[in-house]
Structure formats: C-alpha cells, structure tokens
C-alpha cells in the first residue's frame, strides 16, 4: 500500500490535546497502582499471619489497615485511569500499565525481598520500549457527543458476541478451574481478572465520556444507559479486586503483575478494537507498529516471568558443597516444603545461609548419611509391622 506525502503527514500528525491529557493521567495512574500492589501485599501477609489467608478463601485482610492504605492508593490510581479513558482511546491508555509492572517489581525487590534477576531488569526495559512505541502510534480519540452513541456501539452484534464469550469463559474458570487449580496455576485467578477487566474498561470509558460531556454542559445523567454502564463498572471492579487479591496472596508479586498486565492489556485492546473500531481510523503501517510494540511488551513480561522462576530455582538449590548435591540426588523428592524436602516425615532443611557461610563438618555429613541410609530400613520395618 502506497501513501502520498500528505496522507503520511496526516497519519503521523501528532497527539491531540485530549490524547496528551489521557497520557498524563495514565502515567500518574500507573505510579499509584504499581505502589499499591506492594502495600496491599504487605497487608495481605500481615492479615494472613493472624487469620485465614485470602488465597484460602479468607477475608481477614478487610480488618487490616495496611491493606486499606494500599486499596486507597489503588483507588486513586484507578480514578486517574478512569479519567484517562475519558480523554484517550484504550489502545493508548491501557499499555501504559507497563509502568506499574516496573514499579511493583522494583518495590517487591526492595521491600518484599522478592529478588529481581538481571534479565528481569531487561524485561522492564522492553516493557517501556514497547509502551512508548504504542503511545507514539496510538489512534486519535473519536468525537462522541452522546452516551447513546457509546450504547449503540456496545449493542452491535460483534461486541455482544465478545461480551457473551468473556462472561461464559469467566464463569467456567470460577466454577470448574479455580477449585482445582487456583492454588497452583497463576493463570486461573488472573484469567478471571483479565476477562472481566476488559468489559469493565469499556464500561468505564462509556461512563467517563458521559461524565465528561455532563461537566462540559451536555447532561448525560438523564439517560438510563449511563446508569447501566455504572452498574456494570461496579460489578466488574468488585469481581476483579476479589480475584486479584487471591492471586496476590497466593503467588509472587513479580509474577502476578506482568502476567495480569499482558492478559488484561491484550483483552482490553481486543475489546476496544471491536467496540470502538480504533483500527478503522489507522493505516496498516500504524497498526503493524502498534502490534510490534505490544509484542515487545510481551517479550519483556516473559523475561520477568522466566527470570523469577530462575531466581526461585537458584534459591532452592543453592548448596555450597559437592557432598550436598550428592546427598540431594539420593533423596526421592516426594513433596517439597518452602525450606527443604520432606521424605517419610523427616524434613531435611537446606539451610542455605549456613551452607553458604561455612562448610559442613565431616561428622555432621556422616550423621546425615547414616540418617538417609536408615530411611529405607525404617520403611521396611513399618511395612512389616502393618
């Protein structure tokens, strides 16, 4: 496809004033939301120490002031995010959540001692590059003069089909998969958050447009569609927060944040393209550049996820001597504890710090070998008695 110089300049004529306002609001939103992840995680840990953890179905965190501070911080960020959607298209606003990933991963490394690998830092850089690429090629916000226009877009067959598919998938995850895999697979909780979140963003954008028009002198509060969007926003946000709390309480923050960002952003962009037809106002070059930027973000989040697993593996296998490695190879790994391996009721602690500081005495090694050799004999005696 060939473009004239005039059409090329039109395609890259720069950001409108509304897009700039949306950009500033989205950046400030990411800062607040990224910090709120850490504050809420601290509150969840503190509440879980004295009550039933959120990941196990408990709600003791509702009585924890630190969790509420994190929640208020997140609400401030969400308000800024809400306002950003009223001024700019979702394709511009949503990818800037990459900044919240960087903030939450960095603070988790500093405050929560959740180690961030060197390649994780590279992943953060890729997230920034991808976000900047998308921002520079984002579509201009279309001119909407009434909430009825948004309602007409939301009730077109294509978006109704998408909404039905999202709700159906979320119900299947909640009913079938969460009871079985919620505590072991991070994608289950985050899947519910992301699916419902894509609908909440579309409703938030509709409500934001209605309020913006109302404040500018064109009252939209008299339309029932405005209140329908309000109810949808409330329902979706409550659902998102519930399952996001479970994900944060169950899994590492440095893992939850990037995966949630990728899924949420992908589904939100898809919903925006279907409902608001953002790509209809762009050239093929711009669309491909946006997709390349998004793939760059995906690469960054993949690095963050992968290097977190590498750090966990290093911390669990960090033994100082060849004898330690030899002994561990002789232990059938039936189940794994957070600090060691469990075999026939005997917990063999790795004691990473002690082994790193000084070698184990020969007498201690001999005693450990004797204990290991005695395990099969104990099992035989137990079977004979039974």
UniProtKB/Swiss-Prot annotation:
Function: Acts as a Mg(2+) transporter. Can also transport other divalent cations such as Fe(2+), Sr(2+), Ba(2+), Mn(2+) and Co(2+) but to a much less extent than Mg(2+).
Membrane topology (UniProt): Multi-pass membrane protein
Transmembrane segments: 19-39, 62-82, 83-103, 116-136, 158-178, 190-210, 221-241, 256-276, 284-304
Region annotation (Disordered) ranges: 352-386
Source organism: Arabidopsis thaliana (Mouse-ear cress)
Pfam family, one: Mg_trans_NIPA
Gene Ontology biological-process annotations: magnesium ion transport
Keyword annotations: Cell membrane, Endosome, Ion transport, Magnesium, Membrane, Transmembrane, Transmembrane helix, Transport
Name of the protein in its database record: Probable magnesium transporter NIPA5
């Amino acid at each position: 496809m060939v473009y004239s110089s005039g059409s090329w300049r039109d395609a890259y004529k720069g950001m409108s004033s509304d897009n700039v306002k949306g950009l500033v609001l989205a950046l400030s939103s990411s800062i607040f939301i990224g910090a709120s992840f850490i504050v809420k995680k601290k509150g969840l840990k503190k509440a879980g120490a004295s009550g039933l953890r959120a990941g196990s179905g408990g709600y003791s965190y509702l009585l924890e002031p630190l969790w509420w501070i994190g929640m208020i911080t997140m609400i401030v960020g969400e308000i800024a995010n809400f306002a950003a959607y009223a001024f700019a298209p979702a394709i511009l606003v949503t990818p800037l959540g990459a900044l919240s990933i960087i903030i939450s991963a960095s603070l988790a490394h500093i405050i929560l001692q959740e180690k961030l690998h060197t390649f994780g830092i590279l992943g953060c850089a890729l997230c920034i590059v991808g976000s900047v690429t998308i921002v520079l090629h984002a579509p201009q916000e279309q001119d909407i003069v009434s909430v009825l226009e948004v309602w007409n877009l939301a009730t077109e067959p294509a978006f109704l089909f998408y909404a039905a598919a999202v709700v159906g998938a979320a119900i299947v995850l909640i009913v079938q998969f969460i009871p079985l895999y919620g505590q072991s697979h991070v994608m289950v909780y985050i899947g519910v958050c992301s699916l419902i979140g894509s609908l909440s963003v579309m409703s938030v954008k509709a409500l934001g447009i209605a309020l913006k028009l109302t404040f500018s002198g064109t009252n939209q509060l008299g339309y029932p569609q405005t209140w329908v969007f309000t109810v949808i926003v409330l329902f979706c946000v409550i659902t998102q927060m519930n399952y996001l709390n479970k994900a944060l309480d169950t899994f590492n923050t440095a893992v939850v944040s990037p995966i949630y960002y990728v899924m949420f952003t992908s589904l939100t962009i898809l919903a925006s393209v279907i409902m608001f037809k953002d790509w209809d106002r762009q050239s093929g070059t711009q669309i491909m550049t946006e997709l390349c930027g998004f793939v760059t973000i995906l690469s960054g989040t993949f690095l963050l996820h992968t290097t977190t697993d590498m750090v966990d593996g290093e911390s669990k296998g960090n033994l100082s001597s060849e004898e330690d490695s030899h002994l561990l190879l002789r232990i059938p790994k039936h189940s794994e504890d957070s600090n060691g391996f469990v075999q026939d009721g005997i917990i063999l602690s790795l004691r990473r710090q002690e082994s790193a500081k000084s070698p184990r005495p020969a007498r201690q090694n001999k005693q450990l070998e004797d204990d290991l050799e005695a395990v099969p004999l104990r099992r035989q005696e137990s079977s004979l008695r039974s």
